[in-house]
Amino acid sequence: MSKSPKKSKSLTRAGNRPATISAQQTIPYVRMLPDGICQLPGGVYTKTLEYEDINYSVASAEDQTAIFGGWSSWLNYFDSSLPFQLSFVNRRSRSGSRYKVNISEADDRFNSVRTEYTGMLKNQIAKSNNGIERAKYVTFCIPAENVAARPRLERVEADVIGNFKRLGVQSQPLDGRERLALLHGQLHPGSREPFRFKWADIAHTGMGTKDFIVPDSFDFRQSRSFRVGQTWGAASYLQIMASELSDKLLLEILELDAELTVTMHIQTVDQVKAIKTVKGKISDIDKMKVEEQRKATRSGYDPDILPPDLVTFSKDAAGLLADLQSRNERMFLLTFLIVNTAPTRERLENDIFTVNGIAQKYNCAVKRLDWQQEQGYMSSLALGYNGIEIQRGMTTSSTAIFIPFMTRELRMDGPSLYYGMNALSHNVIMADRKKLKSANGLYLGSTGSGKSFAAKRELLNVFLAIPQDRIIVVDPMGEYAPLVERLGGQVIEIAPDSPNHISPMDVQMDMGGGDSPLSLKADFLLSLCELVVGGRDGLQPIEKTVIDRCVRQVYRELALGLDKAKTPLLQDLYEELLRQPEPEAKRIATALELYCTGSLNLFNHPTNVNLNSRVVCFVLKGMGENLRKIAMHITNDFVTSAVGTNFKNGVATWCYFDEFHILLRDPLTASYFVTVWKMLRKQGCVPSALTQNVKDLLASREIENILDNTDFMILLSQAQSDRAILAKQIGISEHQLSYITQSNSGEGLLFYGSVTIPFVDRFPRGEIYDLLTTKPEDAANGKQAE
């Protein structure tokens, strides 16, 4: 029958009892309290929790077994006095989506880049889950005479939250308004009507809570479908015929691009009663066996040959009794409902056909609730009400196979950055590395896998979304220059024929912190001289003393704060060494001569580049191995100084080190990166290392220290030998390895703390794509387009 909140009908029922039917009366609850307790007819009180997802689909076989065991224990908590309901609600995203683009508008020379990146983010957000928002709830029920049920409800709520926590699942209770908002969404499928409600509105308007959630109308006149407002719907139940179920059945239904609600009403059977019932069934089967044997004897057949079905029933019953008595199994009565909704009847039937196809694949069937559409729809609401009496007896293990977990989502608020789309849930991935215990990161992938693209995308996202943070890039191959220049940054090419100069003698006297700037500079110059002089044993004590004396002398005027003081050059240190009487000073000066007055004097010039630019990129290509070591050492000194200065100003520094395996070859540089990974992160440094050569990376003696202090990692497609190494070193499961095996560019695994997510990033072509890509064919196409 059709029901409208505006028009109510008086119908005559059996016994001439008039019944006023309205849409409000259709919703099966008596009252909703502000604290989230809901009273149902018959003196039942309920509460609802929302819970998050955890990684199951990409977990190892051992972890999946552990999750299954934990979920079984979670189910066993509920006794026969605690019926409960699991609700899985898939709805089309509303305009007030939980996803936000966190890039502020501005009017500057980066408008085109900002507009394009923001447009990309909005498009990815719109595509998240194909516009489907998925949520999971559990509602538990307690029979009681009045709201004195509250203490027990609160105790059960605390237990359920604690049991979820042991599974690694975050959960939170819904208050009254949140439960009403959930019901409003379920009662307005396909609608963009916002939920407007305040508890004060009840006193002001005289309306009840149902008036704020009720749709325009219900129409249950048809036997196999219904209408709510302008939306079509159908309620069905899952007929379980399989002897063994798959953990993929529920997950595949929930992954559909359709609006639906899957509901599991579960009632625990008292253990004594369950065992007694099974024993009774076994007795019945034994009687049937005796009868069959008598028939066989009378007919002259072998009495040991019994009908196959009877043998199967006997074994199943005996196994069930053993499970209940000795294997921590309980007996549950399960009502499994599926409610589909769609804007048209044709779309509704197509969606139901798809769901039924999934069910049949696992030897189950989706059956329509003929002439029970109203009861089925109301039983799908997250209230704890079940008006459908179709129940299936299930053990703990068979119930637990409907595992409600698929993949952990990573959707953080605040200054979070975009890292692609979750390959399993198709949700956008937004994460804030600064919230990790260690923000240090690694990008690992074979040539052409998209690791440089991913790092540059993050760099650009930092630039646009966190305007106060600084960015430093150490680029051995010169791949970042176009992006840095477009962002108004400073590209510093360090090479013998480069016009760019950085003086290793520069010092900031106002760095702050506990260490003296001159002491730090003296320590740096000692290590620089050690690198220049070379030798297996390094600098001798006398040589170190001489260098320290000369350093203090050349910085004397700066230390005294004299107005005429100038920052010394490397040649000033060289000349000061020549003035010293010790023969060791002559040896050091001779070693420095090549870099002061010789052909490699590129570091013997005043700094002529803007080291205070928000984005600084050091390009280290075009130099020999020895010069590269010195250039790297000087660059490292700048990074340390910049991180310290930025930290003093309350600013984070994002550092990117490409071709990391090359940088680790030099012991001094490798030792420096351990310091970065261990110490500089405490000063707001967010370092990222990139490499395609996993073997060389893991061959470094320092890699253990770096890996132990890395909580963020992006793995893209890997060569076969590298996959084996990574699986052993990092502990990647076989299933997880499939995401980095011959995968396309921009596909892989993201590790964020304890969270592992397979991701896909299909970045649209445009100005940003051209700035980020390093593929030769893309560069060629870009030039042709110009």
Short names for language-model regions:
Residues 2-407:
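Extended, folded cores of ATP/NTP-driven motor/assembly subunits in large transport
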Residues 54, 61-80, 91, 252-254, ...:
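P-loop NTPase motor domains
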Residues 443:
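Hydrophobic anchor at the beta1->P-loop junction of P-loop NTPases
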Residues 446:
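P-loop (Walker A) phosphate-binding loop of NTP-binding proteins
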Residues 449-503:
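Walker A/P-loop NTP-binding active-site region of P-loop NTPases
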Residues 477, 689-694, 717-720:
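A short beta-strand-to-loop transition that corresponds to the Sensor-1 phosphate-sensing loop
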Residues 488-493, 702-715:
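A short helix-turn-beta junction within AAA+ P-loop NTPase domains corresponding to the substrate/partner-engaging
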Residues 730-785:
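Conserved P-loop NTPase
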